[in-house]
Swiss-Prot record:
CDD domains: Bact_CD (cd01293)
Cofactor(s) named in the record: a divalent metal cation
Annotated protein name in UniProt: Pterin deaminase
Keywords, in A-Z order: Hydrolase, Metal-binding
Reactions accelerated catalytically: a 2-amino-4-hydroxypteridine + H2O + H(+) = a 2,4-dihydroxypteridine + NH4(+); L-sepiapterin + H2O + H(+) = (S)-xanthopterin-B2 + NH4(+)
Residues reported in the UniProt entry to bind substrate: K85, D331, N332
Record site feature (Activates the nucleophilic water), residues: H263
One Gene Ontology molecular-function label: isoguanine deaminase activity
Function: Catalyzes the deamination of many pterin metabolites, such as formylpterin, pterin-6-carboxylate, pterin-7-carboxylate, pterin, hydroxymethylpterin, biopterin, D-(+)-neopterin, isoxanthopterin, sepiapterin, folate, xanthopterin, and 7,8-dihydrohydroxymethylpterin. May be involved in a degradative pathway for catabolizing pterin rings.
EC numbers: 3.5.4.11
NCBIfam families, per the entry: PRK07583.1
Length: 437
């Protein structure tokens, strides 16, 4: 196969010469940088990165793929997705694009259609797309109201095993915390999650019982050795701020597991003093935050006949400045919560730069879809170009940020263990058997 910008060698040992790499993703090499980009030769041997050298200094006897200053990134980490919901849009669209419309549409579709075969077909379709785009780590939230929790976690466990050599998968139980009032259900859900090696999650809502609910969730997580990943404050309502309650609960219970909060949209609607105090508490509690810029911009401040007044995203800059681990992710894909998307972290990154103003400078921006989410997910071996690490790399013709962010990079080349993979995307027609033609 030929590529317009480089010719990958068919050899066990070779060098990607004259590459441009985001410095924030590189381990074991430093050099002069401009806008956070360095020039390097990357030596690959037997599927591993053997060395990272100054550009133009690799041993002459090695087979070479001249990148001609094209970028080389590590494979991506997509830390907040919904593989169980993916691609149901054609079967159950959101009639008005609203958050409540999405909830109702998904509930109806789940109750009518989410058999094991249906979930597996759509989940694997999504993973094939993600793999082709260059992703090697995904965390998915799974709708976990009974009896769906047992159906979806069983399918997930099977799919995780089948895909373990391509994409590392993690799963989070997603359910309204109000349902913990049913002790039998919550005990069964916790057992299912523990046996599947998953995480406890849920949707937090402002109510008089929020502190007790969070205490119960955290104690269950601690007793079962589970981490927590929550859907938080996905609303424009400034009266809603459960993020502060979550941080207080983590500190109150002395929880030592990892806690992640996704969305946190209403934080951006708070007065400066309230926002700053909340961010300080989040930092003290050691909570990580993931923003979902495409889905948040799609859903938030949507009112018929009215132009949206805000972007829907959380205070990512302020959180990061306070030392809070932060990242961005895909969220929903072609379902009632987001009608578009393909689990492509390049698209997510490109849109995040625009929506969240991650540019000017872009020096460390690449971290939000590589090193940061991988670290939050407990996989520091992923999302990095590291000496001794796997040659899991994504090669681009783009040489500079302006080039990278101005086109979809559809001509990218993905290497896994130093070998070029087939980047053919699955045909949507394959879903006709479950979604309908």
């Amino acid at each position: 196969m030929s590529y317009s910008f480089m010719s990958p060698p068919n050899a066990a040992r070779f060098v990607l010469s004259n590459a441009t790499v985001p410095a924030v993703t590189v381990v074991g090499f430093t050099g002069p940088s401009s806008e956070g980009l360095m020039k390097a030769d990357i030596v690959v041997a037997d599927g591993l990165i053997k060395d990272i050298l100054p550009a133009g200094t690799a041993p002459a006897e090695l087979a070479k793929a001249d990148m001609r200053d094209g970028m080389v990134w590590p494979t991506f980490a997509d830390m907040h997705t919904h593989l169980d919901k993916g691609h149901i849009w054609e079967r159950r669209a959101n009639p008005d694009g609203s958050f409540m419309g999405a909830l109702d549409a998904v509930r109806s579709d789940r109750e009518a259609n989410w058999s094991a075969a249906d979930v597996r077909k759509r989940m694997e379709f999504s993973l094939r797309a993600a793999y082709a785009h260059g992703t090697s780590l995904i965390r998915t939230h799974l709708d976990s109201l009974a009896p769906q929790h047992r159906i979806s976690f069983e399918v997930f466990s099977e799919v995780r095993e089948a895909w373990k050599d391509k994409i590392a998968l993690q799963a989070v139980a997603l359910f309204p915390l109000d349902f913990m009032v049913d002790d039998a259900f919550f005990a069964d859900l916790t057992t299912v999650v523990r046996e599947a090696g998953g995480l406890l999650g849920g949707v937090t809502q402002m109510n008089p019982d929020i502190d007790a609910q969070l205490d119960k969730l955290i104690r269950a997580a601690a007793a079962n050795g589970l981490d927590i990943d929550l859907h938080v404050d996905e609303t424009e309502d400034r009266e809603v701020l459960t993020l502060k309650a979550i941080a207080a609960a983590v500190l109150r219970n002395g929880f030592t597991g990892k806690v992640t909060a996704g969305h946190c949209c209403s934080l951006a609607r708070q007065d400066e003093n309230v926002a700053a105090a909340t961010i300080d508490l989040v930092a003290k509690a050691g909570i990580s935050i993931v923003a979902l810029p495409m889905c948040n911009m799609y859903l938030q401040d949507r009112h018929p006949g009215r132009t949206p007044r805000w972007r829907g995203v959380t205070l990512l800059h302020e959180l990061a400045a306070a030392g809070v681990p932060t990242a961005v992710a895909s969220d929903n894909t072609r379902d009632p919560f987001y009608a578009y998307g393909d689990l492509d972290p390049v698209e997510v990154f490109r849109e995040a730069v625009r929506i969240l103003h991650l540019d000017h400078p872009l020096d460390t921006a690449a971290r939000v879809v590589t090193t940061s989410p991988a670290s939050i997910l407990g996989r520091p071996d992923i999302g990095r170009i590291a000496v001794g690490g796997p040659a899991d790399l994504v090669l681009f013709s783009a040489r500079r940020w302006s080039e990278f962010l101005s086109r979809p990079q559809s001509d990218r080349v993905v290497l896994r263990k130093g070998k070029v993979i087939d980047r053919s995307l699955p045909d949507y027609r394959e879903l006709d058997t479950v979604i309908g033609a």
